[in-house]
Amino acid sequence: MGWASFNLTWAWFLPVIVYGALPLLRLPQQTQAKTELFLTALSVLFMFISATVYKISMGYSVIVLLVGYTALATLSLAKLKVMQGDKFIIASLLCIILLIFFFIVYPTLAIFVSMFYDGDTFAPQQVMRILTQSYIVRVITNSLFLSGFVGIVSTVFGLAFALYTTRIARRTAFIGKIFSILPIVTPPFVVGLGVTLMLGRSGYVTEFLSTNFGFSSHNWLYGFNGIAIAQILAFAPISFMILDGALKSVHPSIEEASYTLRANRYQTFYQIIFPLLRPALANSFLIVFIQSLADFSNPLVLGGSFDVIATQIYFYIAGSQLDYASASTLGSMLLIFSLAIFIIQYIWIGNRSYVTVSGKSYRGDVQELPNGLKYTIIGMLGFWVIFNMALYGSIFYGSFTVNWGVNYTLTLKNYAMLFGQGLSDGAWPSLINTLIYAGIAAPLTAFFGLLIAYIVVRKDFQGKKSLEFLTMLCFAVPGTVAGVSYILAFNNAPLYITGTGIIVIISMVMRDLPIGMRAAIAGLGQLDKSLDEASLSLKGSSWKTLCFIVLPLLKPALLSALVTSFVRAMTTVSAIIFLVTADTRVYRIYFKSCGRRRIRHCDCIRFYFNCCDDGNYFVFRLDCRRYAYFPF
């Protein structure tokens, strides 16, 4: 438990004795409840302040103490008739607040505070010293320029695919959807290394161009070019999903009205349809901008001498020269950029309405696009499909080759090397750890997401919007920043959990918590509140209402959250790469450690987990279609 030399930790349990003496004072119920609540808050503050001052690391027994304090606070608030005295709702709300504070707010504050410390010395001037270095300025400029370029190009491709599936295709729309969504379920590093197999120094496309056309620049891929190609492949599907929904919501009768007023197809598209897509286009650009800014895997594989913020933070932590101050400063800058864009998207775009029709009206038919635009879109989709087929074909074929780029002879030795050495060697330990961590994290994500959604949607209390915003903040915090903030926050007293499997699971849960929450909110929006009221009127508690009324009706939403969280937990890299050790290593870190020297082994792992991730995702889609529900 972390005993001090003078047993300070015994004092943490003394307030519990005081609670037993309070009834002897015969105070009024309201006064006694307020006194108990004050003592609880004071006890928790004393526990954490004393542990911080005396460097006492809390052990697992403190969890029992915190549960006890939470129960006492719940009883006190119930006596004060907070939330109508519903103990389950009060306890759930307290747990959620503690969860958000300790694993979102506290780590975020830790990374900002670390900016102003040089070791244990307070040095506020070092922030400006770091930010004014020419190298740091170049890294920040590179990141912003790359993110802007990828955001624009990904949005263009996403718009083209969305127009194809909604305005051009009749029987072939599924082809566009499959190849547009496939990169979403592709794990990190896969796209980057797949591009390397095709276009790198030993790539077959590079060899073909060199042999037949005298192409001599073999290093053109490593840098801005390679990162941009990989990120566009990875993030254009996100843009597609946003714009596909926006195009489907545009009412066709508007297009018919334009044609009846003698407008041609070019005028209808550029002056009617395109302006209605502006919020979706802006939303797409901002989201892709954040994703590109926070991307860690592709720049690490293809960056070369083109440094970006995410990878530079990693090198400051894991490189030969440990520099927490520079890592914290760059992490804070990355967080500020991401939060600024997230707030713009959340407030500005989220509050705008571009409704095209209200009430009941004639539906009309979708009109054809201009011929020039139509054939351009078909050409873009054809290029995208061929490139992706070559990319994933390279991954499959490369896993069976002796040595990619040198000897293309087929062999099974790569799989035998990884999976034929027993469960204690090769790739098995990392794979088993990954399955265990993801298997624990996914149900917790779905459960806490449902709990937050139920309280936010069904209950009214002060700070509800703030609670929802802080939960959604997990999406805005880049994975690299989250990993660094967890190291800074939990690598010392009072909460020392770095190097354990617990911190990996917590990171997975908190990163994916908004997925479970948004899926449950979407499902609860389809359920009438009268169902809850009927249950409560029949003397059913909130716990029973949630378990026996709401939960069975939210199976599709929970399934979507469960599967999506499991896939994301299996494929996450940027956050947990700072948190794993030799004993808690996951397969993505093992995959990274294979490196170029064993690239064929990487192909085996990539192919195996591509099959797992894609299978999970499409089974999830089929099951959701069975329930006629798909929230994304």
UniProtKB/Swiss-Prot annotation:
Entry-linked PROSITE patterns: ABC_TM1
Annotated compartments: Cell inner membrane
Swiss-Prot/TrEMBL GO biological process terms: iron ion transport; transmembrane transport
Keywords: Cell inner membrane, Cell membrane, Ion transport, Iron, Iron transport, Membrane, Repeat, Transmembrane, Transmembrane helix, Transport
Domain ABC transmembrane type-1: 140-345, 431-632
One Gene Ontology cellular component: plasma membrane
Superkingdom classification of source: Bacteria
Residues that span the membrane, as ranges: 5-25, 37-57, 58-78, 93-113, 144-164, 178-198, 223-243, 270-290, 299-319, 330-350, 377-397, 436-456, 469-489, 490-510, 547-567
One Pfam assignment: BPD_transp_1
Keyword hit for Nucleotide-binding: no
Topology in the lipid bilayer: Multi-pass membrane protein
Subunit structure comment from the entry: The complex is composed of two ATP-binding proteins (FbpC), two transmembrane proteins (FbpB) and a solute-binding protein (FbpA).
Physiological role: Part of the ABC transporter complex FbpABC (TC 3.A.1.10.1) involved in Fe(3+) ions import. Probably responsible for the translocation of the substrate across the membrane.
Protein family per UniProt: Belongs to the binding-protein-dependent transport system permease family. FbpB subfamily.
The protein, known as: Putative ferric transport system permease protein FbpB 1
Source organism per UniProt: Haemophilus influenzae (strain ATCC 51907 / DSM 11121 / KW20 / Rd)
Lineage: Bacteria, Pseudomonadati, Pseudomonadota, Gammaproteobacteria, Pasteurellales
Originating gene: fbpB1
